[in-house]
């Protein structure tokens, strides 16, 4: 199991009191989020990237007995658009790594006024990973496109009906990578995700799976002022049931995570 420094603070927000109650009683839930990879939004830049892999595509199609210049324009466009740009829905749990003294206002207004500060050990136990951010048409996003396009090209095959198809196993491997990568230029956030099985190629999909969460796993609980007493009572009951000697502190949603209580 990986080690995540215990000094790091991880925030998970939700918009409703009932959702927080469910998390405290039944664990945190994996929900579907769309993940997407496109190296650039600019058509001309995308064309340059496609041109770099066309020789490999042409060689692969020729080897399959389907030369590129014999395909109709509709099929060519489908092949080119599917080479290195992908999207899909993946079950996951999202958390934000919060540096000391960082304002929580954006998180509260964007994601909800009920929140948990979860200990690093819990994230490590459940396989959480920090998201890698790459810039639009940056060297990293270009290389990711090249890798994905190459895998897609090498996985091309001809169906019994003569159609050219992408390989599901190759596609699944790439889709499983996408939850850990985001293409964007805004780099102020540090997001972590616990990613569940999507079941694209067989197997059970883990949407709505709950990850056990004990009082010992939580450092703070943030709620609106009028909910502090209610959740303090809930936490004390759960802590007693679980034998937790130091239950998490319930606070009115602060402007930043307290350094200590």
List each language-model region with its residue ranges:
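NAD-dependent ADP-ribosyltransferases
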Residues: 1-261
